[in-house]
Amino acid sequence: MNKTKGFTKYKKMRYIPGLDGLRAIAVLGIIIYHLNKQWLTGGFLGVDTFFVISGYLITSLLLKEYDDTGIIKLKSFWIRRLKRLLPAVIVLLMVVGTATLLLKSDNIIRVKHDIIAAIFYVSNWWYIAKDVNYFEQFSFMPLKHLWSLAIEEQFYIFFPVILVTLLLTIKKRYKIGFIFWGVSIISLGLMMFIYSINGDHSRVYFGTDTRLQTLLLGVILAFLWPPFKLKNDPPKVVKYVIDSIGSLSFIVLILLFFIINDETNWIYDGGFYLISILTLFIIASVVHPSTWIAKIFSNPVLVFIGKRSYSLYLWHFAVISFVHSYYVDGQIPVYVYFIDISLTIIFAELSYRFIETPFRKEGIKALNWRPSYIPQFIRMAIVVTLLIPFMLILVGAFNKYGKDIIGEKANSFDTTIEDNYLMRIAPIDNIHIDGLVSEKKKESSDVYNNIKPLLIGDSVMVDIGESFKSSVPKSRIDGKVGRQLYQTLPLVKANYSQYKKSSDQVVLELGTNGDFTVKQLDDLLNQFGKAKIYLVNTRVPRIYEANVNRLLADAAKRKSNVTLIDWYKRSQGHSEYFAPDGVHLEYKGVLALKDEILKALKKK
Protein backbone atom coordinates (compact mmCIF):
# COMPACT_ATOMS: atom_id res chain seq x y z
CA MET A 1 0.00 0.00 0.00
CA ASN A 2 1.52 3.30 -1.07
CA LYS A 3 0.99 5.96 1.51
CA THR A 4 3.02 8.15 3.77
CA LYS A 5 2.56 6.98 7.32
CA GLY A 6 0.40 9.25 9.42
CA PHE A 7 -0.56 11.64 6.61
CA THR A 8 -3.18 9.74 4.62
CA LYS A 9 -6.66 10.81 5.70
CA TYR A 10 -8.43 8.36 7.97
CA LYS A 11 -11.97 7.61 6.84
CA LYS A 12 -14.28 6.82 9.71
CA MET A 13 -15.64 3.27 9.65
CA ARG A 14 -19.31 2.98 8.74
CA TYR A 15 -21.81 2.84 11.57
CA ILE A 16 -23.20 -0.68 12.10
CA PRO A 17 -26.66 -0.39 13.73
CA GLY A 18 -26.97 -4.18 13.99
CA LEU A 19 -24.22 -4.24 16.62
CA ASP A 20 -26.27 -1.86 18.75
CA GLY A 21 -29.19 -4.24 18.29
CA LEU A 22 -27.05 -7.11 19.53
CA ARG A 23 -25.89 -4.98 22.47
CA ALA A 24 -29.55 -4.44 23.34
CA ILE A 25 -30.17 -8.19 23.51
CA ALA A 26 -27.09 -8.64 25.69
CA VAL A 27 -27.89 -5.88 28.18
CA LEU A 28 -31.55 -6.93 28.47
CA GLY A 29 -30.42 -10.46 29.29
CA ILE A 30 -28.09 -9.18 31.99
CA ILE A 31 -30.72 -6.89 33.51
CA ILE A 32 -33.36 -9.64 33.62
CA TYR A 33 -30.84 -12.00 35.22
CA HIS A 34 -29.99 -9.49 37.94
CA LEU A 35 -33.64 -8.64 38.57
CA ASN A 36 -34.43 -12.27 39.27
CA LYS A 37 -32.12 -15.16 38.38
CA GLN A 38 -35.01 -17.55 38.00
CA TRP A 39 -36.48 -15.54 35.11
CA LEU A 40 -33.43 -15.95 32.88
CA THR A 41 -30.89 -18.25 34.49
CA GLY A 42 -28.25 -17.75 31.80
CA GLY A 43 -28.68 -14.03 31.34
CA PHE A 44 -25.13 -13.48 32.59
CA LEU A 45 -23.96 -14.74 29.17
CA GLY A 46 -24.79 -11.26 27.92
CA VAL A 47 -21.45 -10.17 29.37
CA ASP A 48 -19.65 -12.56 27.03
CA THR A 49 -21.59 -11.10 24.13
CA PHE A 50 -20.28 -7.67 25.10
CA PHE A 51 -16.74 -9.03 25.32
CA VAL A 52 -16.86 -10.51 21.82
CA ILE A 53 -18.36 -7.31 20.39
CA SER A 54 -15.68 -5.22 22.08
CA GLY A 55 -12.84 -7.38 20.77
CA TYR A 56 -14.28 -7.29 17.26
CA LEU A 57 -15.15 -3.62 17.10
CA ILE A 58 -11.97 -2.26 18.67
CA THR A 59 -9.77 -4.41 16.43
CA SER A 60 -11.77 -3.40 13.35
CA LEU A 61 -11.35 0.29 14.18
CA LEU A 62 -7.62 -0.09 14.75
CA LEU A 63 -7.09 -2.12 11.57
CA LYS A 64 -9.10 0.41 9.57
CA GLU A 65 -6.95 3.24 10.89
CA TYR A 66 -3.78 1.31 10.12
CA ASP A 67 -4.92 0.46 6.59
CA ASP A 68 -5.89 4.08 5.88
CA THR A 69 -2.94 5.87 7.44
CA GLY A 70 -0.20 3.29 7.98
CA ILE A 71 -0.13 4.07 11.69
CA ILE A 72 -2.29 3.74 14.81
CA LYS A 73 -2.33 6.79 17.05
CA LEU A 74 -2.44 5.13 20.44
CA LYS A 75 -2.76 8.35 22.42
CA SER A 76 -5.80 9.40 20.41
CA PHE A 77 -7.32 5.95 20.83
CA TRP A 78 -6.90 5.98 24.61
CA ILE A 79 -8.29 9.51 24.89
CA ARG A 80 -11.37 8.48 22.91
CA ARG A 81 -11.87 5.48 25.17
CA LEU A 82 -11.55 7.59 28.32
CA LYS A 83 -13.99 10.19 27.02
CA ARG A 84 -16.41 7.42 26.13
CA LEU A 85 -16.19 5.39 29.33
CA LEU A 86 -14.74 7.25 32.31
CA PRO A 87 -17.14 10.21 32.92
CA ALA A 88 -20.23 8.02 33.24
CA VAL A 89 -18.43 5.64 35.60
CA ILE A 90 -17.17 8.48 37.80
CA VAL A 91 -20.69 9.91 38.11
CA LEU A 92 -22.02 6.45 38.99
CA LEU A 93 -19.34 6.08 41.67
CA MET A 94 -20.12 9.49 43.14
CA VAL A 95 -23.85 8.79 43.26
CA VAL A 96 -23.41 5.29 44.72
CA GLY A 97 -20.91 6.55 47.30
CA THR A 98 -23.20 9.37 48.41
CA ALA A 99 -26.29 7.13 48.42
CA THR A 100 -24.45 4.53 50.49
CA LEU A 101 -23.44 7.19 53.00
CA LEU A 102 -27.03 8.40 53.32
CA LEU A 103 -28.93 5.10 53.10
CA LYS A 104 -26.49 2.28 53.91
CA SER A 105 -23.78 3.92 55.97
CA ASP A 106 -22.76 0.66 57.66
CA ASN A 107 -21.48 -0.48 54.24
CA ILE A 108 -19.42 2.64 53.57
CA ILE A 109 -15.99 1.00 53.98
CA ARG A 110 -16.87 -1.87 51.68
CA VAL A 111 -18.22 0.48 49.03
CA LYS A 112 -15.25 2.84 49.42
CA HIS A 113 -12.87 -0.01 48.63
CA ASP A 114 -14.95 -1.02 45.63
CA ILE A 115 -14.97 2.58 44.40
CA ILE A 116 -11.19 2.81 44.55
CA ALA A 117 -10.86 -0.46 42.63
CA ALA A 118 -13.34 0.79 40.03
CA ILE A 119 -11.51 4.10 39.53
CA PHE A 120 -8.35 2.23 38.57
CA TYR A 121 -10.27 -0.42 36.59
CA VAL A 122 -9.05 -3.32 38.71
CA SER A 123 -12.39 -4.36 40.22
CA ASN A 124 -12.11 -7.89 38.90
CA TRP A 125 -8.74 -8.52 40.59
CA TRP A 126 -9.95 -6.80 43.76
CA TYR A 127 -12.88 -9.20 43.99
CA ILE A 128 -10.62 -12.16 43.32
CA ALA A 129 -8.29 -11.01 46.11
CA LYS A 130 -11.25 -10.66 48.49
CA ASP A 131 -12.73 -14.04 47.45
CA VAL A 132 -16.01 -12.50 46.29
CA ASN A 133 -18.51 -14.81 44.62
CA TYR A 134 -20.01 -13.11 41.55
CA PHE A 135 -23.09 -15.31 41.64
CA GLU A 136 -23.67 -14.69 45.36
CA GLN A 137 -26.36 -12.03 45.69
CA PHE A 138 -26.83 -12.17 49.45
CA SER A 139 -24.61 -9.18 50.24
CA PHE A 140 -24.95 -5.48 49.42
CA MET A 141 -22.34 -4.78 46.73
CA PRO A 142 -23.78 -2.20 44.29
CA LEU A 143 -20.58 -1.95 42.22
CA LYS A 144 -19.82 -5.63 41.77
CA HIS A 145 -20.86 -5.53 38.11
CA LEU A 146 -17.96 -3.21 37.28
CA TRP A 147 -15.64 -6.24 37.13
CA SER A 148 -16.42 -6.62 33.42
CA LEU A 149 -15.62 -2.98 32.65
CA ALA A 150 -12.29 -3.48 34.41
CA ILE A 151 -11.43 -6.36 32.08
CA GLU A 152 -12.42 -4.36 29.02
CA GLU A 153 -10.38 -1.33 30.09
CA GLN A 154 -7.34 -3.50 30.78
CA PHE A 155 -7.81 -4.88 27.28
CA TYR A 156 -8.05 -1.37 25.80
CA ILE A 157 -4.79 -0.36 27.50
CA PHE A 158 -2.58 -3.28 26.51
CA PHE A 159 -4.09 -4.77 23.36
CA PRO A 160 -3.47 -1.81 20.98
CA VAL A 161 0.21 -1.75 21.90
CA ILE A 162 0.52 -5.46 21.19
CA LEU A 163 -1.44 -5.12 17.94
CA VAL A 164 0.73 -2.26 16.67
CA THR A 165 3.89 -4.19 17.52
CA LEU A 166 2.68 -7.25 15.63
CA LEU A 167 1.51 -5.22 12.62
CA LEU A 168 4.92 -3.57 12.35
CA THR A 169 6.92 -6.78 12.74
CA ILE A 170 4.77 -9.41 11.00
CA LYS A 171 3.59 -8.65 7.48
CA LYS A 172 1.26 -11.62 7.02
CA ARG A 173 -1.93 -10.88 8.92
CA TYR A 174 -3.03 -14.49 9.05
CA LYS A 175 0.05 -15.14 11.18
CA ILE A 176 -1.04 -12.41 13.60
CA GLY A 177 -4.48 -14.01 13.70
CA PHE A 178 -2.91 -17.36 14.57
CA ILE A 179 -0.95 -15.74 17.40
CA PHE A 180 -4.14 -14.32 18.92
CA TRP A 181 -5.89 -17.64 18.44
CA GLY A 182 -3.06 -19.38 20.27
CA VAL A 183 -3.32 -16.93 23.17
CA SER A 184 -7.09 -17.49 23.31
CA ILE A 185 -6.46 -21.24 23.61
CA ILE A 186 -3.99 -20.58 26.43
CA SER A 187 -6.64 -18.47 28.18
CA LEU A 188 -9.16 -21.27 27.72
CA GLY A 189 -6.65 -23.75 29.11
CA LEU A 190 -6.05 -21.56 32.15
CA MET A 191 -9.76 -21.42 32.88
CA MET A 192 -10.10 -25.18 32.63
CA PHE A 193 -6.97 -25.84 34.69
CA ILE A 194 -7.76 -23.40 37.52
CA TYR A 195 -11.35 -24.60 37.67
CA SER A 196 -10.25 -28.25 37.80
CA ILE A 197 -7.93 -27.48 40.71
CA ASN A 198 -10.38 -25.83 43.09
CA GLY A 199 -13.78 -25.66 41.39
CA ASP A 200 -13.83 -21.91 42.08
CA HIS A 201 -16.33 -20.30 39.73
CA SER A 202 -15.46 -16.75 40.67
CA ARG A 203 -11.68 -16.95 40.12
CA VAL A 204 -12.10 -18.08 36.54
CA TYR A 205 -15.14 -15.85 35.98
CA PHE A 206 -13.46 -12.64 37.18
CA GLY A 207 -9.92 -13.23 35.90
CA THR A 208 -8.63 -11.19 32.97
CA ASP A 209 -6.35 -14.10 32.10
CA THR A 210 -9.23 -16.57 31.94
CA ARG A 211 -11.74 -14.25 30.23
CA LEU A 212 -9.30 -13.01 27.59
CA GLN A 213 -10.34 -15.94 25.40
CA THR A 214 -13.68 -14.29 24.64
CA LEU A 215 -12.23 -10.89 23.75
CA LEU A 216 -9.60 -12.50 21.52
CA LEU A 217 -12.20 -14.44 19.57
CA GLY A 218 -13.68 -11.07 18.65
CA VAL A 219 -10.19 -9.92 17.66
CA ILE A 220 -9.72 -12.94 15.40
CA LEU A 221 -13.07 -12.30 13.68
CA ALA A 222 -11.94 -8.74 12.89
CA PHE A 223 -8.95 -10.19 11.01
CA LEU A 224 -11.12 -12.70 9.15
CA TRP A 225 -14.24 -10.58 8.60
CA PRO A 226 -13.38 -6.84 8.78
CA PRO A 227 -16.60 -4.84 8.31
CA PHE A 228 -14.91 -2.22 6.13
CA LYS A 229 -14.02 -4.86 3.52
CA LEU A 230 -17.38 -6.61 3.21
CA LYS A 231 -19.10 -6.32 -0.16
CA ASN A 232 -22.63 -4.97 -0.48
CA ASP A 233 -23.72 -7.40 -3.18
CA PRO A 234 -22.42 -10.93 -2.56
CA PRO A 235 -24.00 -13.87 -4.43
CA LYS A 236 -27.43 -14.87 -3.14
CA VAL A 237 -26.18 -18.22 -1.93
CA VAL A 238 -23.55 -16.46 0.20
CA LYS A 239 -26.19 -14.21 1.77
CA TYR A 240 -28.37 -17.24 2.43
CA VAL A 241 -25.54 -19.10 4.15
CA ILE A 242 -24.60 -16.06 6.27
CA ASP A 243 -28.20 -15.46 7.31
CA SER A 244 -28.82 -19.13 8.07
CA ILE A 245 -25.72 -19.55 10.23
CA GLY A 246 -26.34 -16.25 12.04
CA SER A 247 -30.01 -17.02 12.68
CA LEU A 248 -29.33 -20.54 13.94
CA SER A 249 -26.55 -19.26 16.21
CA PHE A 250 -28.82 -16.58 17.64
CA ILE A 251 -31.59 -19.10 18.36
CA VAL A 252 -29.13 -21.39 20.15
CA LEU A 253 -27.70 -18.45 22.14
CA ILE A 254 -31.16 -17.39 23.31
CA LEU A 255 -31.95 -20.99 24.30
CA LEU A 256 -28.75 -21.06 26.34
CA PHE A 257 -29.87 -17.88 28.10
CA PHE A 258 -32.80 -19.94 29.42
CA ILE A 259 -31.08 -23.30 29.93
CA ILE A 260 -27.70 -22.49 31.47
CA ASN A 261 -27.29 -21.35 35.07
CA ASP A 262 -24.33 -20.36 37.23
CA GLU A 263 -24.02 -23.94 38.48
CA THR A 264 -23.60 -25.35 34.95
CA ASN A 265 -20.08 -26.72 35.21
CA TRP A 266 -19.38 -27.34 31.52
CA ILE A 267 -19.34 -23.64 30.73
CA TYR A 268 -16.04 -23.44 32.65
CA ASP A 269 -14.65 -26.42 30.73
CA GLY A 270 -14.80 -24.85 27.28
CA GLY A 271 -18.42 -23.74 27.32
CA PHE A 272 -17.67 -20.02 27.35
CA TYR A 273 -15.40 -20.54 24.35
CA LEU A 274 -18.06 -22.37 22.36
CA ILE A 275 -20.74 -19.85 23.30
CA SER A 276 -18.44 -17.04 22.19
CA ILE A 277 -18.00 -18.77 18.83
CA LEU A 278 -21.79 -18.72 18.48
CA THR A 279 -21.62 -14.98 19.12
CA LEU A 280 -18.97 -14.69 16.38
CA PHE A 281 -21.39 -16.19 13.86
CA ILE A 282 -24.10 -13.75 14.96
CA ILE A 283 -21.74 -10.77 14.65
CA ALA A 284 -20.52 -11.94 11.24
CA SER A 285 -24.10 -11.95 9.94
CA VAL A 286 -25.12 -8.73 11.69
CA VAL A 287 -22.23 -6.62 10.36
CA HIS A 288 -22.67 -7.73 6.76
CA PRO A 289 -24.39 -4.88 4.89
CA SER A 290 -26.65 -7.08 2.74
CA THR A 291 -28.14 -9.68 5.12
CA TRP A 292 -31.71 -9.68 6.34
CA ILE A 293 -30.60 -10.57 9.88
CA ALA A 294 -28.65 -7.29 9.89
CA LYS A 295 -31.90 -5.51 9.08
CA ILE A 296 -33.69 -7.28 11.94
CA PHE A 297 -31.02 -6.28 14.46
CA SER A 298 -31.15 -2.74 13.07
CA ASN A 299 -34.70 -2.39 14.35
CA PRO A 300 -35.06 1.17 15.75
CA VAL A 301 -36.19 -0.07 19.18
CA LEU A 302 -33.21 -2.39 19.54
CA VAL A 303 -30.83 0.29 18.29
CA PHE A 304 -32.30 2.81 20.75
CA ILE A 305 -31.68 0.41 23.64
CA GLY A 306 -28.30 -0.64 22.30
CA LYS A 307 -27.01 2.91 22.12
CA ARG A 308 -27.84 3.22 25.81
CA SER A 309 -26.53 -0.24 26.72
CA TYR A 310 -23.48 1.17 28.50
CA SER A 311 -25.54 3.47 30.70
CA LEU A 312 -28.13 0.76 31.31
CA TYR A 313 -25.40 -1.65 32.35
CA LEU A 314 -23.80 0.91 34.66
CA TRP A 315 -26.96 1.84 36.52
CA HIS A 316 -29.15 -1.25 36.62
CA PHE A 317 -27.15 -3.23 39.18
CA ALA A 318 -26.67 -0.30 41.54
CA VAL A 319 -30.41 0.44 41.44
CA ILE A 320 -31.34 -3.21 42.02
CA SER A 321 -28.84 -3.52 44.88
CA PHE A 322 -30.26 -0.54 46.75
CA VAL A 323 -33.94 -1.29 46.13
CA HIS A 324 -33.76 -5.02 46.88
CA SER A 325 -31.80 -4.48 50.08
CA TYR A 326 -35.07 -3.40 51.71
CA TYR A 327 -36.92 -6.62 50.84
CA VAL A 328 -36.58 -10.32 51.60
CA ASP A 329 -35.02 -12.02 48.59
CA GLY A 330 -37.44 -14.51 47.09
CA GLN A 331 -40.39 -12.59 48.52
CA ILE A 332 -40.07 -9.39 46.50
CA PRO A 333 -43.44 -7.91 45.44
CA VAL A 334 -44.01 -7.50 41.70
CA TYR A 335 -44.25 -3.71 41.96
CA VAL A 336 -40.65 -3.58 43.20
CA TYR A 337 -39.44 -4.84 39.84
CA PHE A 338 -41.30 -1.99 38.16
CA ILE A 339 -39.49 0.39 40.50
CA ASP A 340 -36.18 -1.24 39.53
CA ILE A 341 -36.88 -0.88 35.83
CA SER A 342 -38.22 2.67 36.09
CA LEU A 343 -35.27 3.96 38.11
CA THR A 344 -32.80 2.17 35.84
CA ILE A 345 -34.33 3.78 32.75
CA ILE A 346 -34.37 7.23 34.36
CA PHE A 347 -30.78 7.12 35.60
CA ALA A 348 -29.51 5.54 32.38
CA GLU A 349 -31.23 8.11 30.18
CA LEU A 350 -29.97 11.01 32.27
CA SER A 351 -26.48 9.54 32.14
CA TYR A 352 -26.65 8.95 28.38
CA ARG A 353 -27.99 12.40 27.53
CA PHE A 354 -26.17 14.60 30.00
CA ILE A 355 -22.96 12.72 30.84
CA GLU A 356 -22.02 10.05 28.33
CA THR A 357 -22.90 11.86 25.08
CA PRO A 358 -21.62 15.38 25.97
CA PHE A 359 -18.30 14.10 27.31
CA ARG A 360 -17.82 11.81 24.34
CA LYS A 361 -18.28 14.75 21.97
CA GLU A 362 -16.75 17.62 23.96
CA GLY A 363 -14.47 16.06 26.53
CA ILE A 364 -13.73 18.29 29.52
CA LYS A 365 -15.50 21.18 27.76
CA ALA A 366 -18.75 19.49 28.76
CA LEU A 367 -18.14 21.20 32.13
CA ASN A 368 -18.30 24.99 32.37
CA TRP A 369 -18.62 27.45 35.25
CA ARG A 370 -20.09 30.20 33.06
CA PRO A 371 -23.83 30.55 33.83
CA SER A 372 -24.49 31.55 30.22
CA TYR A 373 -23.78 27.95 29.21
CA ILE A 374 -26.73 26.57 31.13
CA PRO A 375 -26.40 22.78 30.45
CA GLN A 376 -22.66 22.81 31.12
CA PHE A 377 -23.11 24.98 34.21
CA ILE A 378 -25.80 22.71 35.69
CA ARG A 379 -23.67 19.67 34.92
CA MET A 380 -20.68 21.27 36.61
CA ALA A 381 -22.70 22.26 39.69
CA ILE A 382 -24.05 18.72 40.11
CA VAL A 383 -20.62 17.15 39.68
CA VAL A 384 -19.03 19.49 42.23
CA THR A 385 -21.87 18.89 44.70
CA LEU A 386 -21.34 15.14 44.45
CA LEU A 387 -17.57 15.47 44.42
CA ILE A 388 -17.35 16.90 47.94
CA PRO A 389 -18.83 13.91 49.85
CA PHE A 390 -17.20 11.58 47.32
CA MET A 391 -13.70 12.83 48.15
CA LEU A 392 -14.46 12.70 51.87
CA ILE A 393 -15.54 9.08 51.47
CA LEU A 394 -12.32 8.21 49.65
CA VAL A 395 -10.09 9.73 52.34
CA GLY A 396 -11.96 7.77 55.02
CA ALA A 397 -13.77 10.66 56.70
CA PHE A 398 -16.87 8.49 57.20
CA ASN A 399 -15.16 5.22 58.11
CA LYS A 400 -16.54 5.49 61.63
CA TYR A 401 -19.99 4.64 60.26
CA GLY A 402 -18.86 1.28 58.90
CA LYS A 403 -16.78 -1.67 59.99
CA ASP A 404 -14.43 -3.68 57.83
CA ILE A 405 -13.35 -6.52 60.09
CA ILE A 406 -15.53 -8.51 62.48
CA GLY A 407 -14.91 -11.08 65.10
CA GLU A 408 -12.15 -11.86 67.56
CA LYS A 409 -10.12 -14.88 68.60
CA ALA A 410 -12.39 -16.98 70.77
CA ASN A 411 -11.92 -20.41 72.31
CA SER A 412 -11.01 -22.99 69.65
CA PHE A 413 -12.40 -21.04 66.69
CA ASP A 414 -10.27 -19.53 63.98
CA THR A 415 -11.99 -16.17 63.95
CA THR A 416 -9.95 -14.17 61.50
CA ILE A 417 -13.02 -12.79 59.81
CA GLU A 418 -13.52 -10.39 56.96
CA ASP A 419 -17.17 -9.50 56.98
CA ASN A 420 -17.18 -7.43 53.87
CA TYR A 421 -16.14 -10.16 51.53
CA LEU A 422 -17.89 -13.21 52.88
CA MET A 423 -15.19 -14.74 55.05
CA ARG A 424 -16.84 -14.86 58.47
CA ILE A 425 -16.09 -17.66 60.94
CA ALA A 426 -18.53 -18.24 63.78
CA PRO A 427 -17.63 -15.99 66.75
CA ILE A 428 -18.58 -16.33 70.38
CA ASP A 429 -18.37 -12.95 71.99
CA ASN A 430 -19.39 -9.66 70.41
CA ILE A 431 -20.09 -9.78 66.69
CA HIS A 432 -19.32 -6.82 64.46
CA ILE A 433 -21.24 -7.02 61.21
CA ASP A 434 -21.32 -4.13 58.75
CA GLY A 435 -20.63 -1.67 61.54
CA LEU A 436 -23.30 -2.92 63.90
CA VAL A 437 -22.10 -4.31 67.21
CA SER A 438 -24.38 -7.10 68.35
CA GLU A 439 -24.00 -7.89 72.04
CA LYS A 440 -25.09 -11.26 73.33
CA LYS A 441 -28.82 -11.31 73.77
CA LYS A 442 -30.42 -12.97 76.74
CA GLU A 443 -31.66 -16.38 75.75
CA SER A 444 -32.93 -19.48 77.45
CA SER A 445 -30.69 -20.43 80.35
CA ASP A 446 -30.67 -24.11 79.26
CA VAL A 447 -27.12 -25.35 78.87
CA TYR A 448 -26.35 -28.81 77.52
CA ASN A 449 -23.00 -30.05 78.80
CA ASN A 450 -23.73 -33.69 78.05
CA ILE A 451 -23.37 -33.40 74.26
CA LYS A 452 -20.41 -32.30 72.16
CA PRO A 453 -21.47 -32.28 68.51
CA LEU A 454 -19.51 -31.11 65.50
CA LEU A 455 -21.34 -28.56 63.38
CA ILE A 456 -20.11 -27.70 59.89
CA GLY A 457 -21.89 -25.22 57.66
CA ASP A 458 -21.97 -22.05 55.66
CA SER A 459 -23.12 -18.53 56.53
CA VAL A 460 -26.30 -19.80 58.18
CA MET A 461 -24.11 -21.79 60.56
CA VAL A 462 -22.17 -18.60 61.18
CA ASP A 463 -25.44 -16.88 62.08
CA ILE A 464 -26.31 -19.41 64.79
CA GLY A 465 -22.74 -20.07 65.98
CA GLU A 466 -22.66 -17.71 68.95
CA SER A 467 -26.08 -18.69 70.20
CA PHE A 468 -25.51 -22.41 69.76
CA LYS A 469 -22.16 -22.33 71.52
CA SER A 470 -23.72 -20.60 74.50
CA SER A 471 -26.24 -23.44 74.80
CA VAL A 472 -23.84 -26.28 73.98
CA PRO A 473 -20.44 -25.24 75.36
CA LYS A 474 -18.70 -28.44 74.24
CA SER A 475 -19.83 -28.15 70.63
CA ARG A 476 -17.31 -27.57 67.87
CA ILE A 477 -18.53 -25.23 65.15
CA ASP A 478 -16.98 -24.53 61.76
CA GLY A 479 -18.99 -22.09 59.68
CA LYS A 480 -17.81 -20.10 56.71
CA VAL A 481 -19.75 -17.79 54.42
CA GLY A 482 -19.86 -18.99 50.83
CA ARG A 483 -18.94 -22.58 51.69
CA GLN A 484 -20.37 -25.26 49.42
CA LEU A 485 -20.79 -28.96 50.07
CA TYR A 486 -18.23 -30.04 47.48
CA GLN A 487 -15.59 -27.91 49.24
CA THR A 488 -16.14 -29.58 52.60
CA LEU A 489 -14.62 -33.04 52.09
CA PRO A 490 -10.98 -31.82 52.16
CA LEU A 491 -11.79 -29.82 55.31
CA VAL A 492 -13.22 -32.89 57.04
CA LYS A 493 -10.27 -35.09 56.05
CA ALA A 494 -7.81 -32.52 57.34
CA ASN A 495 -9.48 -31.50 60.61
CA TYR A 496 -12.36 -33.77 61.62
CA SER A 497 -11.39 -37.34 60.71
CA GLN A 498 -11.82 -38.38 64.35
CA TYR A 499 -15.63 -38.02 64.19
CA LYS A 500 -16.42 -41.60 63.09
CA LYS A 501 -17.70 -43.41 66.18
CA SER A 502 -21.36 -44.25 66.69
CA SER A 503 -21.36 -42.00 69.76
CA ASP A 504 -20.30 -38.96 67.70
CA GLN A 505 -22.83 -36.43 66.46
CA VAL A 506 -22.24 -34.38 63.31
CA VAL A 507 -24.52 -31.61 62.03
CA LEU A 508 -24.07 -30.58 58.39
CA GLU A 509 -25.75 -27.39 57.21
CA LEU A 510 -24.68 -27.06 53.57
CA GLY A 511 -26.62 -26.17 50.44
CA THR A 512 -27.22 -22.45 50.83
CA ASN A 513 -24.68 -21.54 48.17
CA GLY A 514 -25.19 -24.12 45.46
CA ASP A 515 -26.17 -27.54 44.24
CA PHE A 516 -24.22 -30.78 44.52
CA THR A 517 -24.37 -34.36 43.29
CA VAL A 518 -25.38 -37.57 45.06
CA LYS A 519 -21.78 -38.76 44.86
CA GLN A 520 -20.42 -35.57 46.44
CA LEU A 521 -22.92 -35.89 49.28
CA ASP A 522 -22.23 -39.60 49.82
CA ASP A 523 -18.46 -39.07 49.78
CA LEU A 524 -18.86 -36.52 52.54
CA LEU A 525 -21.23 -38.65 54.62
CA ASN A 526 -19.02 -41.73 54.30
CA GLN A 527 -16.12 -39.79 55.74
CA PHE A 528 -17.87 -39.81 59.13
CA GLY A 529 -18.13 -43.60 59.36
CA LYS A 530 -20.71 -44.69 61.97
CA ALA A 531 -21.29 -41.24 63.45
CA LYS A 532 -24.84 -39.97 63.76
CA ILE A 533 -25.23 -37.35 61.03
CA TYR A 534 -27.88 -34.63 60.98
CA LEU A 535 -28.52 -32.91 57.64
CA VAL A 536 -30.10 -29.46 57.83
CA ASN A 537 -32.01 -28.71 54.67
CA THR A 538 -32.18 -25.22 53.24
CA ARG A 539 -34.47 -22.32 52.55
CA VAL A 540 -32.86 -20.25 49.84
CA PRO A 541 -34.65 -18.33 47.06
CA ARG A 542 -32.59 -19.96 44.32
CA ILE A 543 -33.34 -22.46 41.58
CA TYR A 544 -31.31 -25.21 43.26
CA GLU A 545 -33.27 -25.15 46.54
CA ALA A 546 -35.66 -27.98 45.62
CA ASN A 547 -32.94 -30.30 44.34
CA VAL A 548 -30.70 -29.69 47.36
CA ASN A 549 -33.53 -30.50 49.74
CA ARG A 550 -34.51 -33.58 47.72
CA LEU A 551 -30.96 -34.97 47.82
CA LEU A 552 -30.72 -34.38 51.57
CA ALA A 553 -34.08 -36.07 52.20
CA ASP A 554 -33.11 -39.03 50.01
CA ALA A 555 -29.85 -39.46 51.92
CA ALA A 556 -31.73 -39.56 55.22
CA LYS A 557 -33.96 -42.32 53.81
CA ARG A 558 -31.07 -44.33 52.38
CA LYS A 559 -28.70 -44.22 55.35
CA SER A 560 -29.66 -45.44 58.81
CA ASN A 561 -27.24 -43.11 60.60
CA VAL A 562 -28.53 -39.98 58.84
CA THR A 563 -31.38 -37.79 60.14
CA LEU A 564 -33.00 -34.87 58.32
CA ILE A 565 -33.53 -31.61 60.20
CA ASP A 566 -36.33 -29.97 58.25
CA TRP A 567 -35.48 -26.28 58.47
CA TYR A 568 -37.43 -25.67 55.27
CA LYS A 569 -40.65 -26.83 56.94
CA ARG A 570 -39.95 -25.10 60.26
CA SER A 571 -39.29 -21.74 58.57
CA GLN A 572 -42.30 -21.90 56.23
CA GLY A 573 -44.31 -18.68 56.53
CA HIS A 574 -41.88 -17.08 58.98
CA SER A 575 -40.43 -14.11 57.12
CA GLU A 576 -39.47 -12.65 60.51
CA TYR A 577 -36.79 -15.33 60.74
CA PHE A 578 -34.85 -13.92 57.82
CA ALA A 579 -32.75 -10.95 56.85
CA PRO A 580 -33.74 -9.10 53.65
CA ASP A 581 -31.81 -11.60 51.53
CA GLY A 582 -34.26 -14.35 52.52
CA VAL A 583 -31.46 -16.67 53.67
CA HIS A 584 -29.47 -15.30 56.56
CA LEU A 585 -31.08 -15.19 59.95
CA GLU A 586 -32.46 -12.53 62.22
CA TYR A 587 -32.46 -13.22 65.96
CA LYS A 588 -35.78 -15.09 65.91
CA GLY A 589 -34.50 -17.26 63.09
CA VAL A 590 -31.32 -18.03 65.01
CA LEU A 591 -33.34 -19.26 67.98
CA ALA A 592 -35.69 -21.29 65.77
CA LEU A 593 -32.92 -23.09 63.88
CA LYS A 594 -30.98 -23.71 67.09
CA ASP A 595 -34.11 -25.21 68.61
CA GLU A 596 -34.59 -27.56 65.63
CA ILE A 597 -31.01 -28.78 65.85
CA LEU A 598 -31.14 -29.25 69.63
CA LYS A 599 -34.38 -31.23 69.41
CA ALA A 600 -32.73 -33.63 66.97
CA LEU A 601 -29.52 -33.95 68.99
CA LYS A 602 -31.35 -34.59 72.26
CA LYS A 603 -33.17 -37.55 70.72
CA LYS A 604 -29.83 -39.25 70.01
UniProtKB/Swiss-Prot annotation:
GO molecular function: acyltransferase activity, transferring groups other than amino-acyl groups
SUPFAM superfamilies linked to this entry: SGNH hydrolase
Enzyme Commission no: 2.3.1.-
Entry's Gene Ontology BP terms: lipopolysaccharide biosynthetic process
Record InterPro entries: Acyl_transf_3_dom, Acyltransferase_3, SGNH_hydro_sf
Gene3D superfamilies: SGNH hydrolase (3.40.50.1110)
Regions crossing the membrane: 15-35, 43-63, 85-105, 150-170, 176-196, 212-232, 240-260, 267-287, 310-330, 332-352, 377-397
Keywords (A to Z) from UniProt: Acyltransferase, Cell membrane, Membrane, Transferase, Transmembrane, Transmembrane helix
Domain of life: Bacteria
Membrane topology: Multi-pass membrane protein
Protein name: Putative O-acetyltransferase SACOL0978
Species, as recorded: Staphylococcus aureus (strain COL)
